[in-house]
């Protein structure tokens, strides 16, 4: 028991800064939406449309780079800190390649926007402008993530917290300047949000780079600086570890995007209720997500130390902590669902719909916590391919089809509307949680030599 309590304290020390960093990053999008909405409804809608293209593309790139965290954690735990600098440099090469490809995809996003907004040329023009401004922040964002993954892999989560919070604070005045055209800048409206956010990503990257160049605890890593040229063996390994993570993120993001489109014909009340419930549950999701990041670090570090038993304790502690948090957030959501919905909208019909869906959200929070922390555990074991297969089956083979049948057909029960899709979320996330735990148990029963060999790849 003492081992679990000690591990829980270490996990908490890592997870709390990650929570603050994640909230800061999420809040930047909220700030963009609110400030664009204060300028005009069209600009707010343009930011929302542009973000719907931006988010899947940038999260895919982000997912590819997440492989660096367990790699650094394992090297740090095994005492091979002299090799970390080389892995980070290769991640910069990977980030540069991803940046170019992501920018090209986002630039072509205007075709999707024109299809989505064919009845409103003004909205389409503003959304395209926002996206084209924001795409220049892609390299800054991805380079920042490389440095953040390096710090987190070394069990230092405070730099990401502090710089993420600074980024949120400076995003507000820069937004104001470019939206309203202050201090000699052009008045860009919603497009100004894209300019501001892209600028903030570069500022965050420069601050993180300055920090990593000055931090005393990184001095020994800075001393080992191999030639700055691509190592295709390392690049291939990082890409191979990161691709399943990126695809899993893409599956999740596109699942919610597809459901939003399927709910759209069901009317304003259903759409508004769905969005309120989804927005709030996404905020609650930050807690287990952050525990999952911390669990990746702890499992990777323990495996680097050569301790399979301690890695198992770290994994179990992370999952138990996530379940405990999920129970608290589920109770909170259940008891306060109506007051929370009223914060978003005063329409009684919208509040009633949102409250109903938030009750379903409370049901799946435990499954959601187990699956996202399970993902973190598997990343720590460098078993990322299973993450890809599990998320694909859970979300697209089980979750979405069952949700569609329940929501829009009479095949199983009379049409449930949006609640049917949320029942599909419950089915998909529960299936993912069960498969994650099953896979983790399978890995942990393997011979120690095999587990450590996989971790050392």
Curated annotation (Swiss-Prot):
InterPro entries documented for this protein: MATE_fam, MATE_MdtK, MdtK-like, Multidrug-R_MdtK
UniProtKB keywords: Antiport, Cell inner membrane, Cell membrane, Ion transport, Membrane, Sodium, Sodium transport, Transmembrane, Transmembrane helix, Transport
UniProt-annotated location(s): Cell inner membrane
Chain segments annotated as transmembrane: 11-31, 53-73, 93-113, 127-147, 159-179, 190-210, 249-269, 276-296, 313-333, 357-377, 387-407, 417-437
Family: Belongs to the multi antimicrobial extrusion (MATE) (TC 2.A.66.1) family. MdtK subfamily.
HAMAP family: MdtK (MF_00400)
Protein name in the entry: Multidrug resistance protein MdtK
High-level lineage: Bacteria, Pseudomonadati, Pseudomonadota, Gammaproteobacteria, Enterobacterales
Primary gene name: mdtK
